[in-house]
Amino acid sequence: MSKNFFDYLKLSTINKIEPVAEELSVSKVARGPGGFLEVYRSVRGRPDSMKNQWYTERHNWNKRREGFIKRHLAQIQKQDEPIWDENGHPTRRHLALMMWAYSPDPEGVLSWLDEMKK
């Protein structure tokens, strides 16, 4: 398996997070028809398969995802934004990144999901 520049969150993890994004109206396009999640689900959450799924003739979904993540991480860094709010919940931008199967804090995501179960 080739290494992706930005590690993918597991599809099972994203499936648990998606209802929160939906409730907050985050990442409607990524979650919608023809969006990132539909494609990620179509390859059964296999990151290596995303490079074989084409967004345009010249760009695959893996590259599109990397571009999205780079833009949002740059904004987080530039604006010194936290990715978790004062209550320990992901910010809207962090949720958006998760809907593209990425988090700069994957262990924190798992801990947050565990807390939500309680």
Question: Where do the model's predicted regions map?
Answer:
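Arg/Lys-rich, low-complexity, intrinsically disordered basic segments
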Residues: 1-118
